[in-house]
Design a protein with these regions (language model features):
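Class I SAM-dependent methyltransferase SAM/SAH-binding core
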Residues: 38-42, 46-95
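Conserved class I S-adenosyl-L-methionine
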Residues: 1-37, 48-56, 71-75, 79
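Conserved catalytic/acceptor-binding region of the Class I
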Residues: 136-201
Length: 256
């Protein structure tokens, strides 16, 4: 899925929701970062996590935010303006402009599942990571990502269309094997699953509904059907029978 300015805006707003905040807290708690460390955030988006990492490593440390989107990096630059220890890199995850073994820790959030050759990106991250350094990744089990409240058949068609948005629907199930093959150890998975029963601006569901609707239109789902789907979700929310579920998984691993 290409991150246009509109998609990037929705992504940043979803990241600022309560679920996005709790996800960042989980990443920060899982990532063993100390003052003076160098940390890389792969596909940093609008820089929400970068600002926290910059505080963690302090003035003697450094944080690198990598993203292929110029729009996202512009937002990250604004978000991190007060932090002089942040450098932004405009590139893809399979071509990181950093020396070998230069980072104490690397994090990525909802990134790897969008990369077709994920093995090349994992190998590149491993090149940059110091031996003994930690990689913390969050990816979604997309088979368990679902809105509830619309007509079942229509809902299924919308969700089926959305499956084309990423290359790896169930990447967390594959990561332990891939990381083991690269020499990682102490691999552990943590569920970050959540449920939204409301459709308001403090929930990721509010923004993801808009994102899915736009993507479905691009997959040739009729505009009338997409409109009906959104109307049915709104009615379900008003009647107290709306739901949205998502199953992110945090995978942490130490490079051997």
């Amino acid at each position: 899925m290409e991150f246009s300015s509109d998609i990037g805006r929705l992504q940043r707003r979803a990241a600022s929701s309560m679920a996005g905040m709790s996800r960042r807290q989980a990443i920060l708690e899982a990532l063993p970062v100390s003052k003076g460390d160098h940390v890389l955030d792969i596909r940093c988006g609008g820089g929400h996590l970068l600002a926290h990492l910059a505080k963690d490593v302090g003035d003697d440390g450094h944080v690198f935010g990598l993203d292929p989107s110029a729009d996202q990096l512009a937002e990250a630059k604004t978000h991190c303006a007060e932090h002089g220890n942040v450098t932004l890199l405009h590139s893809f995850a399979d071509a990181i402009d950093l020396p070998d073994a230069s980072c104490h820790a690397i994090t990525s959030t909802q990134t790897l599942e969008y990369i077709e050759d994920v093995d090349a990106s994992l190998a590149e991250a491993t090149r940059v990571l110091m031996p003994g350094g930690w990689l913390v990744n969050v990816s979604i089990l997309w088979d368990h990502f679902c809105f509830y409240g619309a007509d079942a058949d229509l809902n299924a068609r919308i969700h089926d269309a959305f499956r084309a948005h990423c290359h790896h629907q169930m990447l967390p199930m594959e990561l332990p094997g891939k990381l083991t093959a690269l020499g990682y150890r102490h691999i552990r998975d943590t569920s970050l699953a959540f449920v939204n029963a409301r459709l308001n601006a403090n929930t990721p569901a509010f923004y993801l509904e808009q994102l899915i609707a736009g993507f479905a239109l691009g997959q040739s789902v009729a505009e009338a059907d997409v409109t009906t789907w959104r109307e049915q979700l709104a009615a379900a929310e008003a009647e107290g029978r709306f739901g949205f579920t998502s199953f992110p998984v945090l995978t942490a691993a130490c490079r051997g």
